[in-house]
Design a protein with these regions (language model features):
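Non-catalytic alpha-helical scaffolds and adjoining flexible linkers that form interface surfaces
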Residues: 1-22, 27-151
Length: 151
């Protein structure tokens, strides 16, 4: 149950709900993935946000959404990589379970995606940062690959 809790995180996905509302999926620092209804225009993806959350059910009520930094827009491979990150967070992260290492790695990965276009070996760099994120997520979920031993 959340009573006027402030959440810090990122908008992962949203879809229209009724005339002036959206169902949104957030990846928050405090509670991991949180789903809710937002009665205002959602923030762009990949932007750090702060939002007020209330509610007892799995679908919270979000109010007072605030974008914390200037918008970041990805192009080309960085756009598709960001979309991929959001999809695996949405599909793999359990509802309302904090994943602090994964959240930190998500932030690091977004920063690295901003630098992708200026990187000398962009394709190799992209694969590396995506694998680092996947490894952090799987490790925190308890499905990490043990590279120390072989079968």
């Amino acid at each position: 149950m959340m009573r006027n809790e402030v959440l810090h995180g990122y908008l992962i996905h949203h879809r229209k709900y009724r005339e002036k509302s959206h169902i949104v999926h957030l990846f928050s620092q405090e509670y991991g993935r949180v789903d809710g209804i937002l009665r205002q225009t959602p923030a762009p993806q990949y932007q750090p946000i702060r939002v007020q959350a209330t509610g007892k059910s799995e679908l919270k009520n979000f109010t007072q959404l605030e974008i914390l930094h200037q918008p970041v827009f990805f192009h080309g491979d960085a756009f598709f990589a960001g979309f991929y990150l959001n999809e695996i967070v949405l599909r793999l992260c359990p509802l309302e379970e904090a994943l602090p290492q994964t959240f930190r790695q998500y932030q690091v990965t977004l920063l690295q995606l901003q630098q992708l276009a200026s990187h000398a070996q962009a394709d190799l760099f992209l694969r590396q940062i995506l694998r680092q994120f996947e490894h952090a997520l799987l490790q925190e979920l308890g499905y990490a690959i043990d590279f120390a031993s072989d079968a």
